[in-house]
């Protein structure tokens, strides 16, 4: 006979009786585990108890392969969470947005909270140290973090020690990266053929090149390479009945596909917890450190790779670097040997982050505890940039060097009192807290030219002889944040649940008339599946309707002294026969400066069906941001300075999100689980002006097309969304190869007055689709993600897709190269469909049976391929450009400085001893 075992939230398991009288069975959680403990602000709740919108991603669901930081683990896993990177520069982090952009200035995205400490840095946590990540998506769950939560909140929970036996884990991988794509530039024969077709071949300029240079150089092939990466992580966990500990060390060494693009990182983390007084007192100590060395090529190197003519060689006949006759290329527009520059110049950074945290928690009585957290961190950044006089980057200045240093010290103290008791069918919870935070920042910047001694580069900056006024600066600032916060929760039989929170923040950043802000929220949930009338509906495990409303704030756009009148040095004057430094006002005071405020309504339906085999969430949200910060022009002498930062604008974001998890097949040996995330967001700017400060529109975005300086690509105005491309609409080419532009105002003259809306860079939808298969000891997974409905300005094609400068530079191989007979302008001609579907990750692994090996608990080998292919109609390097360049106001431009994205192949091993 066969026995079937089932329980709500767990997969059904069948066992053959086979004459046995005792059968031990372990049930695995379904795709939706209702008992899963999820981190929320200043606490945890089970998934069934949550009334707000919270998405949780555990280690088993993280993206596989190479990860720069925690954001790579989340990419495509949470509906409404957009994580993009325009370039393959491995030293740069990703741009993160949750439910759209909600500010006009300095959008930092979601606030990062690491082990309960707000304001963290994702790069300070090694991906192998992360246990789970929770994303607080609506204001009812975010409001507990007040004036810093309008962009969303991401809670990172690191792995902790256990009371079990001592365990050693090793995770390591090696990886090879190749450029997934590179610009299709003309080779030598094609460059000659195009110039012949255009009638340029007999000109002195072209003949001078053809007669003197005979190479066929692939300049992008010269500045790119095969990258190699390795990562090794070792952790030690253990403990006893009253204590536990975990210590870990991770080493990462990555070499990107662009030469000089490298990162080396050492990360360590240590945590110990001691319990005393019959477990009523719990003491925790955490310490972590991250030491990172970064190296990146300079953006100009890739511009030169676009420009350099393929007949030019990399080296002269004597082995020296080619730079034209007597360095003639130095005097030409954006020309020079990028291989030479990469060999001599550098941009190196040392970035260190150290943190320490102490926590004491005491149970006063059953259900009531008090906790104090003390936290200290220090971050430092030391950048050295050197450009040698013997290549184009330093020739005009006889070598130049930059040293840029900053440090940030942060202190945090938080007290919380937490009550959590159950009285029959009633569960009651309450939280009260106080937070004090101090931040101090110091920086120093020096730029020097004209070096007599170059052997030490930027490390011998005192040998420079041309330190100009304004090229040596230093600064120091500080700000404090004091907060009071609270939360109350109530649940009746997990059927009716209510949560209310409030936070009051006082920040030294705010103007003197608005030092304090209050941020409340309320949410409720109805556990429909817990109603008596649902008890006979056996295929429904959980059905919960949630709704919430809250207010959060954003102070990212405020520097510590933004509300004050500031002065800066401005030249010199002579008095009493001596020269003195002059000063002038550099910023108007605004005592009414305050936080941006975002209110959000959210309604969602959570469901789990068929014993956890099918589950998911569908949600609708509507959020409105008001009092958005922006720098407005003001008249002088009414004001001392010609601009002022003020809270004026309003913006809305509305959207729908869907998450589905389905355990399609579940047998003894084979399992198939599929997950889908889908999100749609609509953005609109509803106000930019008031009675005191006004602007008709914000023209922004640098299209960076040769001969088109001063042009903009985007517009921000009332009644429309962000991301609008705004310039000339091209109707095609005439018989002579000239662009035909729409005469919008019918004045028979094409000018800026004919600019119109020519596309939007924001996607209409984003999706992620994950599939996981297991068969006996084998596992296989693949992950596809993408966007629908967004446009991209193909800047490289606009810059190099016409023949206007081909006698002196290279051009891109495209169908219009010999058909266009005028310079490119910013227009719809260069705007393309940016929708795409990317096979982002594919992994095959095998877990060995280690039951007969006493000293080995787990052994798994795997291979992973990342960015295997992209399905898209976009003709540029990659359709996934940074959606939020220039603070989110001009997204969707592919830059000529972007590194090509890489395709990675990884071999890894996981061992547990």
What are these regions (language model features)?
Residues 746, 780-839:
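C-terminal beta-barrel architecture of Gram-negative outer-membrane proteins
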Residues 1-285, 290, 355, 447, ...:
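Short, small/polar-rich motifs associated with maturation and membrane association
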Residues 760-793:
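Glycine-rich, aromatic-lined ligand/substrate-binding cores of catalytic
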Residues 62, 109, 115, 227-230, ...:
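Extracellular/periplasmic, surface-exposed regions of secreted and cell-surface proteins
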Residues 5, 112, 314-315, 421, ...:
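Short aromatic-centered micro-motifs
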Residues 200-214, 229-231, 301-340:
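Acidic, glycine-rich flexible loop segments
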Residues 169-214, 445-447, 646, 663-761, ...:
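Conserved small-residue
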